[in-house]
């Protein structure tokens, strides 16, 4: 009994189909099997200095938290007069408001329909409301131990940093939650200050540094990048200097943290990008890019 001749597989063109019998073994892999494979077709090529520039948003927010804590410590120790902080804060807010309006060119005001008089009324209402409730804020947490207040403040400030909008499109980002956590931390810390006036000024300062300051920074970053870099450096040096007056070890550790985020992390991101292999091919899930809203009405 003679064996039947085996068909020469070199003369038969291999096809990537499952519904047709082909004269190839089950473990046969053709050279054209992965011809449609594509790697990193949607990968973004990062530049080092561009990543360093974007990391400044994180630096700004860390410095904001540091400055807030330093100012609170100075007021708690009686080294900073509340009237001086209030006057400086109001003057800085006025300068920032004018600067924001000059950079924006009035475009945001035209879109929202908000006038300067309306902005002034909103500011007066907030100041009056906060001042009226400052005795309540001062006595709000009297029944809570100081250690618990400090722990809650640390937790809330960490949550503020985690949920802050750094420009990433992620589900964890929540500007409202981030701001509320920062204000809650400021209320907790303000309740441990000597007088109601201190609590009022501390909460007002928290609104300025956690709500108004990031808005100005985003506008500077979008319109005047060079000025934004200069302001970021000045703000970082101010935060480190303020912390240095309290704790030299803390200032060194904070400076190392800022350097790591602004220099080392972008460097490692660029290096790790060399090892990225994201494959694409006909096996990918189909993406419907057509607008189907007309079928839902």
Swiss-Prot record:
Q: Which GO terms describe its cellular component?
A: endoplasmic reticulum membrane; glycosylphosphatidylinositol-N-acetylglucosaminyltransferase (GPI-GnT) complex
Q: Name one Pfam family in it.
A: GPI2
Pathway where this protein functions: Glycolipid biosynthesis; glycosylphosphatidylinositol-anchor biosynthesis
Q: Which UniProt keywords apply?
A: Disease variant, Endoplasmic reticulum, GPI-anchor biosynthesis, Intellectual disability, Membrane, Transmembrane, Transmembrane helix
GO molecular function of the protein, one example? catalytic activity
One GO BP annotation is: GPI anchor biosynthetic process
Q: What InterPro entries would the database entry show?
A: Plno_GlcNAc_GPI2 (IPR009450)
Q: Which stretches are transmembrane?
A: 51-71, 80-100, 117-137, 153-173, 174-194, 196-216, 227-244, 250-270
Q: Does the keyword section mention Transmembrane? A: yes
Bilayer topology reads: Multi-pass membrane protein
Instruction: From the record heading the sequence, give the disease linked to this protein.
Output: Glycosylphosphatidylinositol biosynthesis defect 16: An autosomal recessive disorder characterized by delayed psychomotor development, intellectual disability, and seizures.
Q: How does it assemble?
A: Component of the glycosylphosphatidylinositol-N-acetylglucosaminyltransferase (GPI-GnT) complex composed at least by PIGA, PIGC, PIGH, PIGP, PIGQ, PIGY and DPM2. Interacts with PIGQ. Interacts with the heterodimer PIGA:PIGH.
Per the record, the similarity remark reads: Belongs to the PIGC family.
| Name under which the protein is recorded | Phosphatidylinositol N-acetylglucosaminyltransferase subunit C
Query: Gene that codes for this?
Result: PIGC
